[in-house]
């Protein structure tokens, strides 16, 4: 568990503890959990749908990051379609999408998402054996727009450690209590205490449905938005995320600058998961800067780290 922060004077300082305390808008990395709402409540379309935009009465057009063509659930994960997730959120309200509509989002619709996300470890404690673990921020505004944002990971915030719980649950079908301690040995080398590896909850959908999400995640790394992140020496699965966020640049209590943050989670080997990695890179692009370039820090870090882990442990 590692964290580094670049200060205003160009120095890196340790930021490791913030992995369990600070929370961030995670973006599309959580779509494996939000699409589970579709599986749980039988909302997944039976045929491929054409990617597009949603326009509600109270919103501007809300679209994917580019036009992604026809897709099923796995393809929607591979290329990180926002539109697919929007339609699931609208169907959850009992409505069929028409341009300019109101969907009548209620607190109950938000709680359906949050309960599913919680079963994956998002928005709740991981149980890690460290003090002052955070659970993130839950938005309080109940609007049609925010329900759609919830569906793509652009509303509530999550800690990096909770994102790790989520990726582990996708990989193994169960959410285990996280721990930095495996065992304690006596002076003679015998095991004095061993971690019990406690299961906190099960994945909230069937194994068949979970396998579809896993295949979508495999496609992310094989030919989708996560292509080139993990060494090709091992079969892997993963999910990228990008989110809009805001910061207070001069500590005056006023959030005054729009930024972009990125996330990525992966596990491998795909067929017998042993390793998972999550990276969160907050505020890597400021919207008021002249350059729109966004440094691919997640891919650079994951590529190097995964290669070293594979060589050492697999």
Spans of model-derived segments:
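Periplasmic/cell-envelope proteins involved in peptidoglycan metabolism and beta-lactam response
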Residues: 1-14, 117, 249, 288-314
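Beta-lactam-recognizing serine transpeptidase/beta-lactamase-like catalytic domain environment
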Residues: 1-27, 33-281
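Extracytoplasmic/secreted cell-surface and envelope-processing proteins
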Residues: 85-87, 97, 286-294
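Short, surface-exposed linear patches
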Residues: 99-100, 173-174, 235, 259-260, ...
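Generic "edge-of-domain/loop-turn" microfeature
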Residues: 272, 284-286, 314
């Amino acid at each position: 568990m590692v964290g580094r922060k670049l200060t205003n004077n160009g120095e890196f300082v340790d930021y490791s503890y913030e992995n369990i305390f600070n929370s961030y808008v995670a973006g599309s990395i959580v779509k494996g959990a939000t699409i589970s709402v579709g599986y749980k409540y039988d909302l997944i379309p039976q045929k491929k749908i054409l990617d597009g935009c949603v326009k509600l009465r109270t919103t501007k057009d809300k679209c994917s990051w580019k036009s992604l063509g026809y897709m099923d659930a796995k393809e929607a994960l591979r290329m990180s379609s926002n539109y697919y997730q929007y339609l699931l959120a609208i169907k959850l309200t009992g409505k069929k999408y028409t341009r300019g509509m109101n969907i009548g989002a209620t607190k109950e619709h938000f709680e359906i998402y949050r309960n599913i996300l919680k079963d994956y470890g998002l928005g709740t404690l991981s149980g890690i054996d460290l003090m002052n673990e955070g659970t993130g921020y839950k938005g309080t505004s109940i609007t049609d727009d925010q329900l759609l944002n919830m569906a793509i990971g652009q509303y509530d915030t999550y800690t990096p450690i909770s994102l790790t719980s989520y990726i582990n649950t996708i990989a193994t079908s169960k959410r285990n209590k996280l721990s930095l301690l495996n065992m304690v040995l006596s002076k003679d080398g015998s095991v004095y205490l061993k971690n019990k590896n406690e299961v906190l909850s099960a994945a909230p959908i069937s194994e068949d449905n979970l396998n579809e999400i896993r295949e979508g995640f495999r496609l992310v790394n094989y030919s989708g938005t996560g292509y080139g992140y993990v060494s090709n020496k091992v079969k892997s699965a993963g999910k990228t995320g990008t989110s809009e966020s805001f910061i207070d640049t001069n500590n005056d209590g006023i959030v005054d600058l729009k930024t972009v943050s990125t996330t990525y989670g992966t596990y491998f080997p795909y067929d017998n998961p042993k390793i998972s990695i999550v990276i969160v890179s907050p505020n890597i692009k400021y919207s008021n800067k002249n350059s729109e370039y966004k440094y691919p820090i997640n891919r650079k870090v994951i590529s190097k780290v995964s290669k070293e882990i594979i060589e050492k442990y697999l």
